[in-house]
């Protein structure tokens, strides 16, 4: 049995639109035949910056194999988006499109190798943004190397500056699973990154590294919507550590005697966490440690516990949480007569937040020829005239901005699909079940 992938570009001869096509095959060979066991095909429209990007307030992504990744600023007049291994920014008020970062140069096909990706971290009201670039570096200072690069794009100066680079000897698929949810810089010379189970604090002046915590699993680390707050479990004490990235101060929520606290998530800037008894901790069939929680607390940004929910009186304990918009669903378990834990009905929590009218909305539209296409619709004012396309320059610097992240402190198990993608799991049993 073998698996292979193919990538190529096709052009619509009538409209000159270009598409990136990727095909994956899973084959079995015998002495007389070849069997096709699985086949998938993905098609993505390639952005054409030479054309007017927005018409009638609509930015069309066209045919895409998955939902476009984008981030908008609070005023919703600037949007950053990722397209075919490149990072773009569009300012509706200025009618300005900028290619923030990308390896493709239109001349060398090797620059189109897409074993890398971006993560948008922040877009401010000027259109400037922070972002991560991770994977294999096709060109530039780190050409031929793999790693994670933290960058800042200045929309007013049209420049991109590398803040630091973490080298890696792992594959792109493995690196994608090793980057935690925390990646932020506060504009005052400090940055934070969760990498391979270590919580790193980086001094951007001398690029020294302080490891705030080790053995931090992805399920234990929670980050607020804005990146202002991050919380994780201290497995030694059972406490919760809470980092304010604006000040760099780490505070603690202390567990009581015989108790263990667990982070569950953030609703905007409010932390959701639970408390359980250490004697109730058990290991499930997949070999994963489970911690039933007898109560759940919501703590606001100021550090005040504003709401508390206790379920043990109903015979229920919380085992997990799902957050969708303003609704919190708590997954529950109950203790059976033989002492084992069984699934129980979930408990909902309604969260009240300020109503907000979205100027930017992503939707799908139907077309007779293309079928479903993704469109980003803008409800504000757009500057008329020809679209500006300024050149974004890289900031040159002397010396090195490579940081030493230390050894990995968390073991991950990767399950690979036949198309080359991978999913990371905390236990071997989970990885085998997925595969």
Name what the model sees in each region:
Residues 64-72, 108-124, 169-184, 214-225, ...:
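Repeated scaffold domains used in trafficking and secretory/extracellular systems
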Residues 2-10, 127-133, 271-276, 328-332:
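A short hydrophobic beta-strand element
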């Amino acid at each position: 049995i073998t698996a292979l992938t193919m990538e190529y570009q096709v052009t619509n001869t009538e409209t000159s639109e270009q598409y990136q096509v990727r095909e994956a095959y899973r084959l079995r060979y015998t002495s007389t035949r070849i069997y096709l066991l699985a086949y998938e095909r993905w098609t993505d429209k390639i952005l054409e910056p030479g054309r007017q990007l927005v018409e009638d307030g609509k930015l069309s992504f066209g045919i895409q194999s998955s939902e476009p990744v984008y981030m908008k600023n609070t005023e919703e007049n600037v949007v950053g988006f990722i397209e075919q291994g490149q990072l773009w920014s569009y300012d509706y008020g200025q009618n300005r499109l900028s290619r923030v970062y990308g390896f493709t140069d239109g001349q060398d096909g090797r620059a189109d190798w897409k074993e890398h990706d971006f993560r948008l971290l922040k877009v401010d009201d000027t259109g400037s943004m922070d972002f991560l670039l991770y994977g294999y570096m096709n060109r530039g200072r780190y050409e031929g190397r793999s790693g994670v690069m933290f960058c800042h794009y200045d929309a007013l100066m049209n420049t991109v500056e590398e803040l630091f680079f973490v080298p890696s000897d792992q594959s792109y698929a493995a690196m994608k699973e090793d980057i935690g949810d925390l990646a932020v810089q506060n504009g005052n010379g400090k940055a934070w990154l969760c990498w391979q189970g270590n919580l790193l604090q980086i001094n951007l002046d001398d690029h020294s590294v302080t490891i705030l915590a080790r053995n931090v699993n992805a399920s234990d680390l929670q980050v607020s919507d804005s990146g202002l707050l991050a919380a994780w479990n201290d497995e030694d004490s059972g406490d919760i550590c809470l980092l304010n990235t604006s000040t760099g101060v780490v505070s603690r929520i202390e567990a009581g005697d015989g108790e263990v606290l667990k982070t569950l998530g953030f609703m905007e800037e409010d932390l959701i966490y639970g408390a359980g008894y250490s004697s109730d901790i058990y290991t499930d069939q997949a070999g994963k440690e489970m911690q039933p929680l007898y109560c759940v607390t919501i703590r606001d940004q100021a550090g005040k516990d504003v709401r508390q929910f206790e379920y043990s009186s109903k015979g229920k304990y919380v085992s997990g949480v799902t957050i969708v918009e303003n609704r919190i669903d708590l997954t529950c378990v109950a203790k059976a007569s033989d002492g084992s834990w069984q699934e129980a009905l979930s408990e909902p929590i309604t969260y009240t937040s300020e109503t907000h009218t979205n100027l930017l909305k992503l939707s799908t539209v139907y077309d007779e020829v293309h079928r479903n296409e993704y469109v980003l619709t803008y409800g504000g004012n757009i500057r008329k005239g020809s679209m500006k396309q300024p050149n974004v320059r890289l900031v040159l610097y002397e010396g090195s901005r490579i940081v030493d992240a230390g050894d990995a402190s968390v073991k991950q198990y990767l399950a690979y699909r036949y198309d080359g993608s991978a999913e990371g799991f905390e236990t071997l049993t989970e990885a085998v079940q997925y595969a």
